[in-house]
Regions:
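Catalytic cores of nucleotide-sugar-dependent glycosyltransferases that transfer UDP/GDP/TDP-activated
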Residues: 1-502
Length: 502
């Protein structure tokens, strides 16, 4: 199968969030399964220069002229390879749009021309597919930044020889980010205004690029089975639950996998000691002591160490941490926070660290090495999200034997099995899970974890249950292949029956 994946970011070329990890790991898994995969992303020179382990890229002879509204925009095409794979990567190089400090925002403000930038990128993907003669069986677009691609394929690409049966799959990674713009930006797309209607591209008078992808793609996916159900409800659908409900038969939830070449305690180069499920107690003890020492916390092997690596926002449940912080810090615990986000929560966590230096460490910003060390060195991991389409850190935690404490939403509900008596007896439990979005409920579950942490055999069983499951992309990639086959089948004409067939 020939597959083109289009994404606004992908590790190791650029990254702002989990989309970048998925856009890299899924193509590699598909290629390992024998498929011909091409990845197309923008080239962000300033970000690329700062990416650790960024691979070399080279110029190609291909130059694109892309229509954006009434003007033509020139771009170069660079070429690289996803490390550890045979996945070809084409990077669209257009400095006016992409040679910036950020991908979508700068100084906490969205770029005012984001619509124009990603309309350009979507059209550049189509032009690259044509000029490179890729002839894909399926084009897989991701989130609002590439939401125009399914519409362009439906309206324009099907007129091209060899591309008339190309199918489209559109993945929703987070309903909260929809790419909503002034209605007059519709002219940038180059599509007829007849498509600016409530069934396709219009949302309460605005152009909505996420809705565009949802409307035009042959098959839709999102990043966990539970989230696929949630987004068809008013609570989680962010205003698009109606159109998602109307396409329920075309919507598939697939839990993301983990790139275990990067995230695995047996091979992780950032750890004080590598370990496996067979020596988890010894390995994690060494990693815990190293983490406590690095962060200036007292090295106490028997105190439960809770960690968080996250955007510090309300969506990630930091309001709950604030609600229960005082009573939590009355307990004999240590807390480690790594991340950035809402200044209110950054200040809260800085203040907790200043007031309780023997119990709390707060690092504002992102550090790849430290994020691995937090996953390996902590005993438990906090993810009390208000909503969570998939989540990756809870799966990293399970792989590393770090017991997750999560709210049962989205992918968290699909990956973490609560340590109830029944689940423990069945050997299924791997963490702690709760439903109410309240600080006292989070605190109660942290107390549950503290109590079970003192019961070493039961705690070890929780760790080993999580570590023994295959969290890699192998199974998720196979599910995507079935989705691609389904999309392709919708675009292939039914064979005509001969006269003697009944």
């Amino acid at each position: 199968m020939r597959i083109v994946v289009a994404s606004s970011e992908a590790v190791p070329f650029s990254k702002t969030g989990g989309l970048a990890d998925v856009a890299s790991a899924l193509p590699k898994a598909l290629a390992r399964a024998g498929h011909e995969v091409t990845l197309i992303v923008p080239h962000y020179p300033q970000l690329f220069a700062k990416m650790p382990d960024a691979p070399p890229v080279e110029s190609t002879p291909l130059a694109l002229r892309v229509a954006v509204g009434q003007k033509m925009v020139d771009a170069r095409v660079l070429k690289g390879t996803l490390p550890g794979s045979n996945v070809t990567v084409y990077l669209i190089d257009q400095p006016i749009y992409f040679d910036r400090k950020g991908v979508y925002v700068e100084n906490d403000q969205d770029y005012r021309d984001n619509c124009e930038r990603f309309v350009f990128f979507s059209r550049a993907v189509i032009e690259a597919v044509r000029h490179l003669n890729l002839k894909p069986d399926v084009i897989h677009a991701n989130d609002w930044q590439t939401g125009l691609i399914p519409a362009l394929v439906e309206v324009e690409l099907r007129q091209q020889p060899g591309l008339d049966h190309t199918a489209t799959v559109f993945t929703i990674h987070n309903m909260a980010f929809q790419g909503r713009f002034w209605h007059w930006d519709m002219h940038l797309t180059g599509l007829d205004w007849k498509y600016f209607n409530w069934r396709q591209m219009e949302y309460f008078g605005h152009l909505n690029l996420l809705k565009t992808g949802i409307s035009f793609a042959d098959v839709l996916t999102t990043v966990s089975p539970t989230y696929a159900r949630e987004i068809q409800t008013p609570e989680y659908g962010c205003g698009l639950h109606g159109i998602l409900g109307s396409r329920a038969s075309d919507l598939v939830g697939i839990l993301n996998g983990v790139d275990t070449e990067i995230w695995h305690p047996t091979t992780d180069p950032y750890l004080a000691q590598n370990y496996s499920v067979d020596n988890v107690e010894i390995g994690k003890a060494a990693c815990k002591a190293a983490l406590q020492q690095r962060l200036g916390l007292p090295v106490r092997p028997n105190v439960p160490l809770f960690g968080s690596v996250s955007r510090m926002t309300g969506q990630k449940g930091f309001s709950l941490i604030g609600q229960c912080a005082d009573v939590l810090l009355d307990q004999d615990v240590q807390l480690v926070f790594l991340g950035s986000g809402d200044p209110r929560y950054e200040e809260l966590l800085r203040q907790l660290a200043a007031e309780h230096p023997d119990k709390v460490s707060t690092t504002i910003g992102y550090n790849e090495e430290l994020s691995h060390q937090v996953e390996a060195g902590c005993d438990a991991f906090l993810m009390p999200s208000e909503f969570e389409p998939c989540g990756l850190n809870q799966m990293y935690s399970l792989i590393y034997g770090t017991v997750p404490i999560v709210r049962a939403v989205g992918g968290l509900a699909d990956s973490v099995v609560d340590a109830s008596d029944q689940n423990l007896a069945a050997g299924a439990a791997n963490g702690f899970s709760f439903h109410e979005f309240r600080g006292e409920t989070l605190f109660w579950n942290i107390c549950r974890a503290r109590t079970m942490y003192a019961d070493k055999p039961t705690w070890r069983k929780l760790q080993q249950t999580g570590m023994r499951r295959d969290w890699s992309w192998k199974h998720s990639a196979a599910e995507y292949v079935r989705v691609y086959e389904r999309a392709i089948a919708k675009r292939r004409p039914e064979p005509e029956c001969s006269g003697d067939e009944r």
